[in-house]
């Protein structure tokens, strides 16, 4: 494994471990509340989403849901991939696609 690849894997592991603190089987979080825009979420991607509507961020492998906040606001609830412990001898695969199909997984030689 090249030193660049080792550094990339090390950075990924640090990110994954820090994400593990959130929730071990994937995580949900509410992100910044937005002002009410006709009862819809405005994620600044050019689209408005009704409360209960889901959309996807394929680049970061997230599922985002527009939820009702408090005091006349809406919020974006984000679902992300579970975090895996490091498996020596295995390769971490990033399959791409839309959540949850884009979630990384380990491919081990003897499994």
From Swiss-Prot:
InterPro entries: SVWC_dom. The keyword Secreted applies. GO terms for molecular function: toxin activity. It comes from the Eukaryota. GO terms for cellular component: extracellular region. Residues 1-26 form the signal peptide. Its main location: secreted. Expressed by the venom gland. It is found in: Secreted. Contains 4 disulfide bonds. Keywords: Disulfide bond, Secreted, Signal, Toxin. The keyword Secreted applies. It holds the Pfam family SVWC. Belongs to the scoloptoxin-16 family. This is U-scoloptoxin(16)-Er8a. The lineage of its organism: Eukaryota, Metazoa, Ecdysozoa, Arthropoda, Myriapoda.
